[in-house]
Amino acid sequence: MRSLLVLLALAACASAQFFIRGGDDDNGFFGDDDNGYYYPRYFPIYNRFPIYRPIYYRPQIYYPIYRPIFGYGGYGYGGYGGYGYGGYGYGGYGYGGYGGYGYNPYSYGGFYRFGDDDNGFDD
């Protein structure tokens, strides 16, 4: 029973990290950048109430299909030229961040988990 609770806690933490950490930029691969707010163009509620992100966010099972094809997100750029601009960042207006080279071990991933850029922090 205890091990089951531990597994459930780990799963909850993993899913929370998946939904909460945005601004993902994989340095030009698949042109992916969700700018921290997961398509705010279509769901403006994210800009003021980020807690609703997990509710409206597209189902995780489709992520490997959506991301390579519709990788650009909301307001801003996907990865660019192998370096990866972070797009327009927070809510489409503020921090951009820059993908830099390699991966960021201190930010939580999206699906591909390389070249992450969490709006300029911990690059």
Swiss-Prot record:
Transmembrane segments: none annotated. It comes from the Eukaryota. One of its GO terms (cellular component) is extracellular region. Keywords: Secreted, Signal. It is found in: Secreted. Prismatic layer of shell (at protein level). Expressed primarily in the mantle with highest level in the mantle edge and lower level in the mantle pallium. Residues 1-16 form the signal peptide. May be involved in calcification of the prismatic layer of the shell. This is Prismalin-14. It comes from Margaritifera margaritifera (Freshwater pearl mussel).
